[in-house]
Amino acid sequence: MSRRGVLIAGVAGLVLAGLAVSPRALRKVDFFKIRRVEVRGARYLVPDTLVAALRLGPEASLFDRTAGLADRVFAIRGVAEARVTRRWPGTLVVTVREHQPVALAEHEGVLGLMDRRGWVLPFDPTRDPRRLPVADPDAAVALVLGRVMDAEPEVFTGIERAARVGKDILLSGGGHRYLLRSDATVRDIQALGAVVRDLAGRGRDFVELDARFTDRVFVRGMTL
């Protein structure tokens, strides 16, 4: 049998033997102490931040409960989902899904990445290669940007600035302005995108598209 096979067989034997032993006793076995933490899914958060959140002591074992560990990771601002699993004999695997940034927004005097909830996250902006718009740190602005990103990604890539104007949202970029209600639906945004494509197909430019009205998009400053 190969060395790897011997190791696997040994682990299996220990686990089977452990069926007759309490988890408390197995926690004291050095073989099952956590020696490595593997982080998966982190794009913006630094892995060391996630590992530190686990607060693992020197005696931490794979037989410790993992639910509490996942809760600690989930508590980090910017983590949407967290799961902690074991890989025998001594590795913890931390898998996270992060909230997706939709804009850059100012927070305490510096620009940070803002998600679609309007939260400015503890993410390093340089870790996102996309060119994101600069936006007001506002939940309604973030929500509309998130919907535009999902429903009309081509329109989203042209947005440079996003702001709240009264009850409405103003998006601008490339010499174009888009007006939307703060509660704009996917259907409203798709209607706006359809007009953008129609005008481009006919070689027409415009200054502003006003999509604040149901089933209507008003074009202002259109070139003939």
Regions inferred by a protein language model and the residue ranges of each:
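Charged, solvent-exposed interaction patches on well-folded alpha/beta domains
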Residues: 1-38, 45-75, 81-224
